[in-house]
């Protein structure tokens, strides 16, 4: 699998093999996606990652890399299917784009990794999911505002020192059916 490597403005620099991602330098960025999956009760699905990979044991939303020349939406739909067993059809009907290319940095061991993250929101009727046991240890459903506080606190893989309010407001709007921007495949 190849990953595209970008500069901070999102311009493609080069392609690397997945195994080389920890070798990117401080001026290079990868692209990824993340999704607030919300049930009818207004609870957000929080994953606890298994103790391996880039974010061992961390709390997270459904997230992943953009592989090769995938679009952001294709990557998000793939991750929803892989990690949670959500079908392409369901994801395409209800997924909403909330923010594109949020600069995001986190430590993996001693290495600082930089991502340009596209944030999505998926409101669904069911809380039933099928976990990808190779990546996810367990899930919990937390109320929307409690999830926002968890992210702000730095207890997830998301950086603590970022102003998330614009994203949180868009997620609230999706939950309250005020956000109607569908994504294109």
For the regions a protein language model found, what residue spans apply to each?
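Short loop segments at secondary-structure junctions
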Residues: 9, 39-42, 50, 123-128, ...
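Residue-level structural signal for beta-strand termini and adjacent loop
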Residues: 18-19, 50, 135
């Amino acid at each position: 699998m190849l990953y595209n490597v970008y500069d901070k403005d999102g311009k493609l620099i080069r392609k690397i093999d997945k195994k080389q991602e920890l070798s990117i330098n401080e001026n290079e960025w990868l692209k990824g996606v993340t999704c607030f999956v919300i049930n009818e009760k207004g609870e957000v699905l929080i994953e606890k990652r298994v103790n391996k990979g880039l974010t061992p044991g961390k709390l997270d939303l459904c997230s992943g890399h953009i592989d090769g020349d995938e679009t952001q939406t294709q990557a998000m739909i793939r991750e929803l299917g892989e990690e949670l067993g959500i079908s392409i059809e369901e994801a395409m009907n209800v997924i909403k784009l909330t923010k594109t290319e949020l600069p995001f940095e986190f430590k993996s061991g001693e290495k600082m990794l930089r991502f340009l993250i596209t944030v999505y929101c998926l409101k669904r009727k069911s809380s039933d999911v099928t976990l990808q046991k190779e990546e996810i240890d367990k899930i919990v459903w937390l109320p929307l505002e409690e999830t926002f506080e968890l992210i702000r606190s730095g207890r997830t893989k998301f950086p603590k020192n970022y102003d998330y309010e614009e994203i949180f407001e868009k997620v609230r709007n999706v939950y309250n059916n005020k956000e109607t921007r569908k994504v294109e495949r």
